[in-house]
Protein backbone atom coordinates (compact mmCIF):
# COMPACT_ATOMS: atom_id res chain seq x y z
CA UNK A 1 0.00 0.00 0.00
CA UNK A 2 1.45 3.41 -0.90
CA UNK A 3 1.54 6.43 1.42
CA UNK A 4 -1.54 8.29 0.07
CA UNK A 5 -3.62 5.09 0.34
CA UNK A 6 -2.29 4.46 3.85
CA UNK A 7 -3.15 8.01 4.95
CA UNK A 8 -6.60 7.77 3.34
CA UNK A 9 -7.23 4.47 5.16
CA UNK A 10 -6.36 6.14 8.48
CA UNK A 11 -8.32 9.32 7.76
CA UNK A 12 -9.86 10.60 10.96
CA UNK A 13 -7.41 8.62 13.09
CA UNK A 14 -4.93 10.52 15.25
CA UNK A 15 -1.59 11.28 13.64
CA UNK A 16 0.13 11.10 17.04
CA UNK A 17 -1.20 8.95 19.89
CA UNK A 18 0.58 9.22 23.23
CA UNK A 19 -0.65 6.86 25.94
CA UNK A 20 0.69 6.72 29.48
CA UNK A 21 4.04 8.32 28.60
CA UNK A 22 6.30 8.58 31.64
CA UNK A 23 9.93 9.67 31.85
CA UNK A 24 12.21 8.99 34.81
CA UNK A 25 15.90 9.71 35.33
CA UNK A 26 18.34 7.56 37.30
CA UNK A 27 19.96 9.81 39.91
CA UNK A 28 22.09 8.36 42.73
CA UNK A 29 20.57 4.87 42.30
CA UNK A 30 17.00 6.19 42.43
CA UNK A 31 14.44 6.81 39.68
CA UNK A 32 13.32 10.44 39.73
CA UNK A 33 10.09 11.11 37.79
CA UNK A 34 10.19 13.93 35.25
CA UNK A 35 6.87 13.33 33.45
CA UNK A 36 4.04 11.06 34.59
CA UNK A 37 1.46 9.19 32.50
CA UNK A 38 0.82 11.73 29.75
CA UNK A 39 -1.97 10.76 27.37
CA UNK A 40 -3.05 12.79 24.36
CA UNK A 41 -3.89 12.53 20.65
CA UNK A 42 -3.11 14.93 17.83
CA UNK A 43 -5.14 14.63 14.63
CA UNK A 44 -4.09 16.00 11.24
CA UNK A 45 -4.54 19.77 11.15
CA UNK A 46 -4.73 20.08 14.93
CA UNK A 47 -2.36 22.01 17.17
CA UNK A 48 -1.72 20.93 20.73
CA UNK A 49 -0.23 23.17 23.40
CA UNK A 50 1.46 21.42 26.29
CA UNK A 51 1.59 23.91 29.14
CA UNK A 52 2.83 23.69 32.69
CA UNK A 53 5.19 25.05 35.27
CA UNK A 54 8.91 25.07 34.73
CA UNK A 55 10.23 21.56 35.41
CA UNK A 56 6.87 19.86 34.89
CA UNK A 57 8.14 17.64 32.06
CA UNK A 58 7.02 19.48 28.92
CA UNK A 59 10.39 19.42 27.16
CA UNK A 60 11.42 16.03 28.54
CA UNK A 61 8.25 14.35 27.27
CA UNK A 62 8.66 15.92 23.83
CA UNK A 63 12.31 14.90 23.66
CA UNK A 64 11.31 11.35 24.62
CA UNK A 65 9.19 11.14 21.46
CA UNK A 66 12.27 11.99 19.39
CA UNK A 67 14.67 9.71 21.25
CA UNK A 68 16.73 12.68 22.42
CA UNK A 69 17.06 11.82 26.10
CA UNK A 70 20.34 10.94 27.85
CA UNK A 71 21.26 7.36 28.72
CA UNK A 72 20.09 7.69 32.33
CA UNK A 73 16.49 8.21 31.17
CA UNK A 74 13.78 5.55 31.32
CA UNK A 75 10.75 6.00 29.07
CA UNK A 76 7.58 3.96 29.51
CA UNK A 77 4.18 4.04 27.85
CA UNK A 78 3.37 4.21 24.18
CA UNK A 79 3.67 6.75 21.38
CA UNK A 80 2.37 5.97 17.91
CA UNK A 81 3.06 8.19 14.93
CA UNK A 82 0.61 7.45 12.12
CA UNK A 83 -0.08 4.10 13.79
CA UNK A 84 3.60 3.09 14.22
CA UNK A 85 5.18 2.76 17.67
CA UNK A 86 8.09 5.22 17.89
CA UNK A 87 9.39 4.94 21.45
CA UNK A 88 11.24 1.72 20.62
CA UNK A 89 12.87 3.05 17.42
CA UNK A 90 16.66 3.23 17.38
CA UNK A 91 19.48 4.26 15.04
CA UNK A 92 18.60 4.65 11.37
CA UNK A 93 14.89 3.96 11.92
CA UNK A 94 14.71 6.85 14.38
CA UNK A 95 16.81 9.17 12.19
CA UNK A 96 14.48 8.51 9.23
CA UNK A 97 11.44 9.91 11.03
CA UNK A 98 13.21 12.64 13.02
CA UNK A 99 12.99 15.87 11.04
CA UNK A 100 10.88 14.33 8.30
CA UNK A 101 7.76 13.12 10.10
CA UNK A 102 8.21 14.62 13.55
CA UNK A 103 10.27 17.53 14.83
CA UNK A 104 10.65 19.72 17.87
CA UNK A 105 11.17 23.46 17.86
CA UNK A 106 13.18 24.34 20.92
CA UNK A 107 12.32 27.38 23.00
CA UNK A 108 15.85 28.76 22.62
CA UNK A 109 16.95 28.18 19.02
CA UNK A 110 20.50 29.37 19.76
CA UNK A 111 21.08 26.01 21.47
CA UNK A 112 19.56 24.05 18.57
CA UNK A 113 21.18 25.82 15.61
CA UNK A 114 24.86 25.08 15.00
CA UNK A 115 26.78 28.36 15.33
CA UNK A 116 29.49 27.39 12.81
CA UNK A 117 27.11 26.84 9.88
CA UNK A 118 24.79 29.28 8.13
CA UNK A 119 21.06 28.92 8.63
CA UNK A 120 20.72 28.03 4.94
CA UNK A 121 23.30 25.25 5.16
CA UNK A 122 21.46 23.71 8.12
CA UNK A 123 18.09 23.75 6.36
CA UNK A 124 19.63 22.35 3.14
CA UNK A 125 21.29 19.56 5.12
CA UNK A 126 17.91 18.54 6.59
CA UNK A 127 16.16 18.65 3.20
CA UNK A 128 18.88 16.64 1.45
CA UNK A 129 19.05 14.02 4.19
CA UNK A 130 15.30 13.42 4.47
CA UNK A 131 14.07 14.12 0.95
CA UNK A 132 17.09 13.32 -1.25
CA UNK A 133 16.98 16.74 -2.92
CA UNK A 134 19.75 18.05 -5.13
CA UNK A 135 21.70 20.99 -3.68
CA UNK A 136 19.98 23.48 -5.99
CA UNK A 137 16.48 22.11 -5.31
CA UNK A 138 17.19 22.11 -1.56
CA UNK A 139 18.39 25.74 -1.70
CA UNK A 140 15.25 26.80 -3.58
CA UNK A 141 13.05 24.97 -1.06
CA UNK A 142 14.98 26.43 1.90
CA UNK A 143 14.42 29.96 0.59
CA UNK A 144 10.74 29.16 0.05
CA UNK A 145 10.45 27.87 3.64
CA UNK A 146 12.18 30.96 5.06
CA UNK A 147 9.72 33.10 3.10
CA UNK A 148 6.78 31.00 4.39
CA UNK A 149 7.69 31.85 7.99
CA UNK A 150 7.66 35.57 7.15
CA UNK A 151 11.34 36.37 7.50
CA UNK A 152 11.66 39.87 5.99
CA UNK A 153 14.68 38.97 3.80
CA UNK A 154 14.84 35.19 3.26
CA UNK A 155 18.10 35.33 1.28
CA UNK A 156 19.82 37.36 4.00
CA UNK A 157 18.59 34.92 6.67
CA UNK A 158 19.70 31.98 4.50
CA UNK A 159 23.25 33.37 4.31
CA UNK A 160 23.40 34.38 7.99
CA UNK A 161 24.94 32.57 10.92
CA UNK A 162 22.57 32.07 13.86
CA UNK A 163 24.22 34.81 15.96
CA UNK A 164 23.53 37.31 13.16
CA UNK A 165 19.75 36.88 13.52
CA UNK A 166 17.47 38.11 16.29
CA UNK A 167 15.91 35.60 18.67
CA UNK A 168 12.60 35.78 16.82
CA UNK A 169 14.31 35.29 13.46
CA UNK A 170 16.19 32.25 14.80
CA UNK A 171 12.89 30.84 16.04
CA UNK A 172 11.38 31.31 12.57
CA UNK A 173 14.42 29.64 11.00
CA UNK A 174 13.86 26.64 13.29
CA UNK A 175 10.19 26.54 12.26
CA UNK A 176 11.24 26.65 8.59
CA UNK A 177 13.66 23.78 9.16
CA UNK A 178 10.94 21.76 10.91
CA UNK A 179 8.35 22.22 8.16
Where are these regions (language model features)?
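ABC transporter nucleotide-binding domains
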Residues: 1-179
Amino acid sequence: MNMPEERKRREGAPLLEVDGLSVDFAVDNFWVPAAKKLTYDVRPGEALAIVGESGSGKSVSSMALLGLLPKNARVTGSARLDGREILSLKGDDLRRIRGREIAVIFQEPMTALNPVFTVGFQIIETLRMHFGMTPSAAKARALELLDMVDLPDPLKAFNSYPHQLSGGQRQRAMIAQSI
